[in-house]
Design a protein with these regions (language model features):
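Signal peptide-directed extracytoplasmic domains
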Residues: 66-249, 256-257
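Bacterial extracytoplasmic/cell-wall-associated proteins, especially those involved in peptidoglycan
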Residues: 188-191, 203-412
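Acidic/Ser-Thr/Pro-Gly-rich, low-complexity N-terminal segments
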Residues: 1-40
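N-terminal short leaders/motifs
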Residues: 37-47, 86-90, 333-336
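A broad, low-specificity signal for short, low-complexity segments enriched in glycine/proline
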Residues: 45-51, 92-96, 339-344
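Intrinsically disordered, low-complexity N-terminal regions enriched in serine/proline/glycine
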Residues: 2, 7, 64, 345-348
Length: 412
């Protein structure tokens, strides 16, 4: 910048040598041309820095986008794969989550290999939670084709309300698989040419001998379950529903997976607090729910539960045919006098009170009915319609009339 001096401004004789020699140095600097501006250079460097930063952000964003969308190069195996491996798909998982699981298990070379291949197969979005037999070192396309194949899913089975541990032979000689038999079948898978099946006998042995707490039985059920006949300790403690177990597990591991999942379901149905204010323990409510499940169709659950409460309150024997049938190899719609006369813990014609364990797997509706029965004075009921509807009575005479009606309707 130019330096100004008042004395210098008054002397205009710029060519006087004498005067020039006496001019202070600071004044001579005033004649020099102004230095070049530096602010422009600073601005240029700032702009260059900003461009570099933006470029780095763009490159990083593009790389991340490639990772998410599968654009660009990625590792991929060739072919259908080699050895078998079981992987688990959990509820709520996305395609990316499944891809990560497959990569961790060595099924695909990279998650992106599966994600890219899945884009051309809409069935991937329908993959359900559970266990799947996959091939290691498979191409992304082969892995997608494998996981959407229904034959690849293993270890899944369904338990219906009213199911029992042991299988039942119906009057027409058809066999209804019990929970133990279903678990045995669910344990089966073919892994590298070897079967993972666990025989029903091994599973039954675990029911009789395993530590119930280690199997996952809820604390509120353990004392009563341990008092039961060994083969019936888990009766009623497997809630109805769809279950997934991992083939290749031991007999005890299979039961632990099943019982633990069931305990979670029972808790979701508000057990054991559901039994509060009933006058009965949670296990007793579970027993009553199993009777309701076996004795009635859904619309009559509340009334049958009330009959149970009323008869127990009045000291009457329950006299439920379902408890007689429970211990028979071949249950019948109408039990015989001989069967009703047999001595046994589950004979509610000969014994007062509830049977020692549940006789089936009660569903949520039966549990709620057992905890909160309908209001009424009924003491008797009989199935009086072919659809399973029951007729209820408060007196023995009314009950006899209902039985005659049932016969006339061909209900039994």
């Amino acid at each position: 910048m130019t330096y100004h001096d008042s004395h210098y401004d008054e002397d205009l004789d710029l060519f006087d040598e004498a005067r020039t020699e006496k001019i202070p140095a600071v004044r001579r600097r005033g004649k020099q041309p102004p230095p070049p501006p530096r602010k422009k250079k600073r601005k240029t460097f700032v702009w260059i820095g900003m461009v570099v930063v933006l470029a780095l952000i763009a490159v990083g964003g593009y790389y991340g986008y490639k990772q998410l969308t599968g654009i660009g190069d990625y590792d991929d195996f060739a072919g259908q794969g080699k050895e078998d491996v079981i992987i688990q798909v959990k509820g709520g998982e996305s395609t990316g989550d499944i891809a990560a699981t497959l990569h961790d298990a060595g099924v695909v070379a990279s998650s992106r290999a599966f994600v890219v291949a899945a884009e051309s197969n809409a069935k991937v979005r329908g993959v359900q939670p559970g266990y799947y037999v996959m091939k290691k070192q498979a191409s992304g396309k082969a892995a997608v084709a494998k996981i959407v194949d229904p034959k690849s899913q293993v270890g899944q089975f369904d338990i219906k309300p009213g199911a029992q541990l042991e299988s039942i032979t119906q009057p027409d000689n058809t066999v209804v698989d019990g929970i133990t038999a279903k678990l045995a079948k669910a344990s089966c898978a073919d892994l590298n040419g070897k079967s993972t099946c666990v025989p029903p006998e091994q599973l039954a042995q675990v029911v009789q001998t395993a530590d119930l707490a280690k199997l996952g039985v809820p604390d509120w059920a353990i004392p009563d379950a341990n008092k039961a006949e060994p083969k019936r300790r888990l009766e009623g403690l497997i809630a109805p529903g769809v279950y997934d177990v991992k083939p290749g597990s031991t007999a005890e591991e299979l039961w632990t997976q099943l019982v633990s999942a069931s305990a979670t379901q029972l808790q979701a149905w508000n057990m054991p607090t559901l039994a509060d204010n009933t006058g009965y323990t949670p296990y007793q409510v579970l027993v009553m729910a199993s009777l309701v499940e076996k004795e009635a169709i859904t619309k009559d659950f509340g009334k049958v539960s009330r009959v149970t409460y009323n008869r127990l309150h009045d000291g009457m024997r329950l006299q439920y045919d379902s408890t007689i049938n429970y211990v028979l190899d071949r249950p019948a719609i109408r039990t015989s006098d001989a069967d009703r006369d047999k001595v046994g813990a589950y004979n509610t014609y000969g014994n007062s009170g509830l049977p020692p364990t549940p006789i089936s797997a009660p569903g949520e509706g039966a549990l709620k009915a057992a905890a909160a029965p309908e209001q009424g004075a009924w003491l008797y009921f009989v199935k009086c319609e072919k659809d399973g509807t029951s007729c209820f009575a408060t007196t023995d005479d009314e009950h006899e009339a209902n039985k005659n009606k049932a016969r006339a309707n061909g209900a039994y």
